[in-house]
Amino acid sequence: MTDETNKNGPEAAAPEEFDAAAQPETAEEPEADVSAAAPDPLELAKAENAELRDKYLRLAAEMDNLRRRTERDVKDAKSYSVAGFARDMLAVSDNLRRALDAIPADAREAGDAGLKALIEGVEMTERSMLAALERHGVKQLDPTGQKFDPNFHQAMFEVPNPEVPNNTVVQVVQAGYTIGERVLRPAMVGVAKGGPKAASSEGETPPA
């Protein structure tokens, strides 16, 4: 019996050896290439530099716009802060002019020294007031002979005149004024009617 066991022993063990040999060996996976997946430090630095430069340019542009807006606001505040006061002073100037216009020409010539001194005093006051307003950017409009401009003039009536182009200012009822680039008060005017067509406004300068 021992012989039979010895005889069959190697043959019994053979299938196990065969099975072990038949099983494929587990293949070792290659290590991942870490160096290929890592970002290039130089490219990262370039991208960061480009982003910072873009932020800097945007900030510089915003600061420049803010500076310009601030300068414009300060200039406007300085130029137009006296607009209300100037408008009130123009009403006083209008009354002085009406007082002077109410004096007949013969009374001016034949008047005594007291009347002449009064007239000179009123005229001097009017000139001084207008000069003071002009120092603060208030300028008088003199549109006589100019083409009517609704931005600067207010038409009060029409004057039939075939010799003057249509819509030409032929009479100023009340002077107009500007402050800076804005109209403080439009000039009240009379415009011509019945004449030839007015020339094109191209190339014309703003009313003085």
Curated annotation (Swiss-Prot):
By its UniProt entry, which PROSITE patterns does this protein fall under? GRPE
Domain of life of the organism encoding this protein: Bacteria
What the entry lists under CDD domains is as follows:
GrpE (cd00446)
Q: Which GO terms describe its molecular function?
A: adenyl-nucleotide exchange factor activity; protein homodimerization activity; protein-folding chaperone binding; unfolded protein binding
Keyword Chaperone belongs to the record: yes
Query: What subcellular compartments does it reside in?
Result: Cytoplasm
Provide this UniProt record's keywords sorted from A to Z. Answer: Chaperone, Cytoplasm, Stress response
Pfam families (alphabetical): GrpE
Leader sequence range is: none
Annotated segments matching region Disordered: 1-43
Q: Can you cite an annotated GO cellular component?
A: cytoplasm
For the biological process aspect of GO, one term held by this record is: protein folding
What family does the entry list? Answer: Belongs to the GrpE family.
User: Record's HAMAP family?
Assistant: GrpE
Q: What does this protein do?
A: Participates actively in the response to hyperosmotic and heat shock by preventing the aggregation of stress-denatured proteins, in association with DnaK and GrpE. It is the nucleotide exchange factor for DnaK and may function as a thermosensor. Unfolded proteins bind initially to DnaJ; upon interaction with the DnaJ-bound protein, DnaK hydrolyzes its bound ATP, resulting in the formation of a stable complex. GrpE releases ADP from DnaK; ATP binding to DnaK triggers the release of the substrate protein, thus completing the reaction cycle.
Q: How does it assemble?
A: Homodimer.
Q: Extract the NCBIfam families matched here.
A: PRK14140.1, PRK14141.1, PRK14150.1
Task: Quote the protein name from its UniProt record.
Answer: Protein GrpE
The protein's organism comes out as Sinorhizobium medicae (strain WSM419) (Ensifer medicae)
User: Gene symbol?
Assistant: grpE
